[in-house]
UniProtKB/Swiss-Prot annotation:
The keyword Transmembrane helix applies. Its main location: membrane. Keywords: Membrane, Transmembrane, Transmembrane helix, Transport. The gene is YSL5. This is Probable metal-nicotianamine transporter YSL5. Residues 12-22 have a biased composition (Pro residues). It comes from Oryza sativa subsp. japonica. Expressed in roots. InterPro entries: OPT, YSL-like.
Length: 668
């Protein structure tokens, strides 16, 4: 196997070597209470955004900051009220990380398992909006939301998620050294909030973080004024390279978070994402679009699986699955070899950082301490495996009671496939910070609707979508939180327990808040505030799925097979060719992300890596010392802006200006 890739920036330093609280002390009633309040807030915000614009920003950074302020306010209020004994033990960075983990676990259910996209796709209003005469849209395929079945369904499908690949946390965080940009930024922010800002390198990093966090927040606030109503205005739609390139999503959208991802991720990841943008949006999609009317009807919507959208989703997923499954098999082969040899060996894994500096002894000691703590309070493998099997067995029996259309053997298939899919999604999130759980959910929707057929396939597909989304999303969130915990010296055992507590809270809070929206507002009204834009899309996808793979456009499956094999071959080449060659071979998983998201994501990350490359050429030591702090500041500032942005949206305050562009020849 080839030597590991060189990281683009030095890893952030851990907190100073103070005595660490035991894992039990990192879990507090105060923390659970704060997480419940914060999780409820996240559920409301996510449901609100999902029902209006359908776009959900990353909220882990904002959650870490809010957890700090809420817990600090708790202790301050107790002191003011003379309840000193209620202040409890000191508020540590470990408790802050655990609270953030719990709150995200609760709030993410509003995005995944209890998503309004697939739940409202089952209701009568969406059935009527699609049209009673729409082929395949049957009155029998209606299931209106109610607290009873939603809460029960959440407990059945959500608690199992954290068990799926928790035993691979060492592979993700330590062996692969995946960046998890959002988790790294959150950890650096938490460390800065709890650290001492003495005039040393750590203090200067904190000042750098605060500086760029303020700049990023200010820029996001400034951009908001020009973003108008909808998603077609503002700097996010700036045709940087011209109108024609903009039509193919080639533009720089001035998103500080994406530039931060480029600064914090290895160069090979950023270049792979950009290469994927060029291949897909520069050549592949324009070529397929020219076949409209031949390969597929040319009058389809942008979200119809029977058209160009089908190519985008299935080809992207084929590459992701090819890369993910290759690495999953590779990991298991390495583990099996170690067991057979009865001794531990070092293995070369993708995107692993090398410390080539002669003065890196302190960083080596820091990483050694981080690793020791991360491996100290482990989650037993027998517990993870048995927990997954027991919960899967219970769910396999109980889910068909709620959704008779989804037979027990189909539920079993879901749980058989879920760990492999969860690994692929977590691996991709570690590279690019994008959670593609909704994409995997759409694939599950299509596949299981086709397996069931016209008699109940719509409801079965939508329910299977919820099962897969819940497991895949919670697993990726947990792995990202493990990265934060690794950098804040938090116990993985306390984080796993807090994840389970957060999921349990979310199983009640997410359905309750969604049901409140359902009862208080006219959900799905095309002319109203809460249009639920994805509900109709998901129902139509399920209806199309009933036809099976025959509904896909011409040559779609053949092209998918080619890209799946290409992903396997590229990974194999990286493992067999010499290091001086393999380090230039792109990563298929990273290449696949812009296939579906858009080329602008690759452009933004590539600009980030160009900045870092130039910085390293000018002053390598300064770049290694401050790149992660700058990147984290950019990510944190944009993430924190999501809080006031969501509040303004909830209050119905729209940006005053819509800045848009058109060709000069069209000017009047």
């Amino acid at each position: 196997m080839p030597p590991p890739e060189t990281s683009s920036a030095a890893a952030p330093s851990p907190p100073s070597p103070d005595p660490l609280p035991p894992w039990r002390d990192q879990l507090t009633l105060r923390g659970v209470a704060v997480a419940a309040v914060l999780g409820s807030l996240l559920c409301v915000v996510i449901h609100r955004l999902n029902l209006t614009v359908g776009v959900i920003p990353a909220l882990n950074v904002a959650s870490g900051l809010l957890a700090f302020f809420l817990a600090t306010a708790w202790r301050g209020a107790a002191a003011v009220l003379g309840l000193g004994h209620h202040r409890g033990r000191p508020f540590t960075r470990q408790e802050n990380t655990v609270i953030q983990t719990c709150a995200i676990a609760c709030g993410s259910l509003a995005f995944s398992g209890c998503s309004s996209s697939y739940i409202f796709a089952m209701d009568r209003k969406t059935y009527e909006l699609v049209g009673q005469d729409y082929p395949g849209n049957r009155m029998e395929d209606i299931r209106d939301p109610s607290l009873g079945w939603m809460i029960g369904f959440m407990f059945l499908i959500a608690l199992i998620g954290p068990f799926s690949i928790v035993m691979l946390r060492k592979v993700m965080v330590i062996d692969y050294k995946l960046a998890f940009p959002g988790g790294t930024a959150t950890a650096l922010m938490i460390n800065s909030l709890h650290g001492k800002t003495e005039a040393d390198l750590a203090g200067r990093k904190v000042h750098c973080l605060v500086k760029y966090m303020s700049l990023s927040f200010g820029w996001s606030f400034f951009k908001w004024f020009f973003s108008g109503v909808g998603d077609s205005c503002g700097f996010d739609n700036f045709p940087s390279f011209g109108i024609e390139a903009f039509k193919n999503t080639f533009y720089f959208n001035f998103n500080p978070s994406y530039v931060g991802y480029g600064l914090i991720s290895p160069h090979i990841v950023n270049c792979s994402v950009f290469l994927g943008s060029v291949i897909s949006w520069g050549f592949l999609w324009p070529f397929i679009a020219k076949q409209a009317g031949d390969w597929y009807p040319d009058n389809l919507s942008n979200t119809d699986f029977r058209g160009l959208y089908g190519y985008k989703v299935f080809i992207a997923i084929s590459v992701i699955l090819g890369d993910g499954l290759y690495n999953l098999v590779k990991v298991f082969l390495i583990i099996a070899k170690e067991i057979c040899n009865a001794r531990s060996k070092e293995h070369d894994l993708p995107v692993q950082a090398l410390l080539q500096d002669d003065d890196s002894s302190r960083q080596l000691l820091d990483e050694k301490r981080q690793t020791e703590i991360f491996l100290k309070d482990s989650i037993p493998t027998w517990l993870a495996v048995s927990g997954y099997i027991v919960l899967a067995a219970i769910s396999t029996v109980a889910v068909p009671i709620i959704f008779p259309q989804l037979k027990w053997y189909l539920v079993l298939v879901c749980y058989f496939l879920a760990p492999a899919i969860a690994f692929c999604n977590s691996y991709g999130m570690g590279l690019t910070n994008l959670n593609l759980a909704p994409t995997y959910g759409k694939i599950a929707l299509f596949v299981f609707a086709s397996l069931v057929g016209s008699d109940g396939g719509v409801i079965a597909g939508l329910a299977a979508c919820g099962v897969i989304m819940s497991i895949v999303c919670s697993t990726a969130d947990l792995m990202q939180d493990f990265k934060s915990g690794y950098l804040t010296l938090s116990s993985p055992r306390s984080m796993f327990i807090s994840q389970m507590i957060g999921v349990a809270l979310g199983c009640i809070i997410a359905p309750l808040t969604l049901w409140l929206f359902w009862t208080a507002f006219d959900i799905g009204d095309p002319d109203g505030e809460y249009k639920a834009p994805f509900a109709i899309i998901f129902r139509e996808m399920a209806i199309i799925g009933i036809e099976g793979f025959a509904a896909l456009p011409r040559h779609c499956l053949e092209i998918c097979c080619v890209f799946f094999l290409a992903a396997l071959i590229i990974n194999l080449m990286k493992d067999v060719v010499p290091n001086h060659v393999s380090r230039f071979i792109p990563i298929p998983m990273a290449m696949a992300v812009p296939f579906y998201i858009g080329a602008y994501f690759g452009v933004d990350m590539f600009i980030g890596t160009l900045i870092l490359f130039a910085w390293q050429k000018i002053d390598r030591r300064e770049a290694d010392d401050y790149a992660v702090a700058v990147a984290s500041g950019l990510i944190c500032g944009d993430g924190v802006w999501s809080i006031p942005s969501a509040v303004l949206s909830i209050l119905g305050v729209d940006p005053p200006i819509c800045m848009s562009f058109r060709p000069s020849s069209a000017s009047v």
